């Protein structure tokens, strides 16, 4: 199938030819980065070095992380590929979970609020609409009670509405007006009834990992790095991808009955890499309300309990970082073969020194 210009049609979702995104049978896919940094000093304040302690049992066991099964957050059948170039120093050897911090971002608005405001729901699906309102914060519910659609819409997009979202305006406004009026088309349910029936459980929006959908003909890694840079304010040179590890996948069925896939690459940042909301970053101002580095226990608490797959992804990342060691190539060869060579790449190896097609943690 071709387009009007004579060029073959291209899907921005699966990156294949022959169909457009709206016709794609693959899950709606986003790409992102799970960045980590390591606080300097070992458990007793000593610097982490390559030695027997680095190769000992993982300090973070199944009791701390829950069941070993990853559920739908999978590493794939062969999670670790043969080594490719990597540039992470010895500061990542012998990690214990209390020294690892993961970068999380907090959305400006909840997914439920954004989906409602964009009209991404069926007016005749009260169960789904109710689920959207139950995801909203108390502040968002108050906004819906207080302001009209025009004011809410402009605030949602930070008064920077692109052509893409202007096309959604009429549809979203039409559904909003139907709910305000109630009547036969909405089964008698009104906007007011949905607001009053919401559980009002949340005071802040969701936390998660930087991610987003790729642009036309953009590679997966390029998309992940771009979204990471836009949403964190960090330059792409400030994070180093662990390239011999396949991305972690979060697969789930949304309340709208659409399949979603979030694919995350693991990346290392220096221990002194700091983050904050940049008032000059238009993407952060529009989409992000907070950002920070968090140890495992605090990070898992910030992810909402119903986001089971996202929690499993976080568990998977910590299992990898506590079970495997990232070694410069010369140290890796010394460990596994007794010989050292110049210019060899960094390797991700398990704590028993296994190399090659090492499988990820189960």
Which residue stretches match the model-derived regions?
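Long, compositionally biased low-complexity repeat segments characteristic
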Residues: 40-62, 337-344, 350-351
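Cysteine-centered loop/knuckle micro-motif
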Residues: 21-25
